[in-house]
């Protein structure tokens, strides 16, 4: 994201608001959700809405990306895939796979920024996407300390869920069939499921 591209996105948001409000009925006052990078899209440059106090903000967070979604090492990607996140979960066996950014303090600061910029100004916020990949023995990359890797994923999920709720953000875990089998109504990844639930307590 850049200031220039965010300006284009804001113009799209304005078109969206105008189109919805113009249809009348409940769409006159329906809450509308805007997405964008929190560094550039702020209440001060929100598009104009003729209905006051009916805009919400959606935020996605996959930090640190090298831990949550990165699939390949350099030279294919810009960083190495990281297996270990959080205090007490770093590996002494393969330290090159430890996270080097995006750990608790940095993520906490991000939540506080969003709270200050949006929640404290009365703008509802959704954490519309967050999740972390979990490696296993059949993965392309196999952590040498699998227990620490699994705990890293558990702790990240719980942390993100808990901190979201603590500052008034509603979290929505990004789930594409790896955690739940919606056809048979069963849980496929009990650890991730339990980690989400733990974050709500």
Name every feature range the model reports, one short phrase each.
Residues 47, 137-201:
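Aromatic-rich peripheral "rim/lid" segments of glycoside hydrolase catalytic domains that contact
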Residues 1-102, 112-133, 166-167:
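Active-site region of glycoside hydrolase catalytic domains
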Residues 101, 109, 146-147:
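Short secondary-structure boundary micro-motifs
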Residues 40-42, 103-104, 180, 189:
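Alpha-helix initiation/capping motif
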Residues 9-15, 107-111, 151-158:
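Well-ordered, non-membrane alpha-helical segments in soluble/globular domains
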């Amino acid at each position: 994201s850049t200031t220039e591209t965010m300006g284009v996105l804001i113009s799209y948001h304005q078109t969206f608001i105008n189109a919805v409000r113009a249809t009348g009925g409940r769409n006159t006052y329906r809450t509308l959700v805007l997405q964008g990078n929190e560094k550039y899209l702020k209440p001060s440059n929100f598009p104009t809405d003729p209905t006051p106090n009916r805009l919400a903000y959606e935020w996605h967070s996959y930090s640190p990306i090298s831990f949550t979604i990165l699939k390949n090492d350099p030279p294919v990607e810009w960083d190495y895939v990281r297996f270990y996140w959080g205090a007490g979960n770093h590996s002494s066996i393969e330290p090159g796979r430890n996270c080097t950014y995006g750990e608790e303090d940095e993520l906490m600061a991000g939540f506080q920024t969003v709270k200050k910029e949006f929640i404290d100004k009365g703008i509802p916020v959704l954490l519309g996407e967050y999740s972390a990949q979990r490696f296993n023995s059949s993965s392309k990359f196999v952590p040498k300390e699998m227990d620490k890797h699994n705990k890293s994923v558990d702790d990240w999920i719980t942390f993100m869920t808990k901190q979201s709720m603590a500052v008034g953000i509603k979290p929505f875990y990004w789930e594409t069939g790896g955690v739940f089998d919606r056809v048979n109504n069963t849980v496929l990844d009990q650890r991730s499921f339990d980690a989400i639930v733990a974050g709500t307590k």
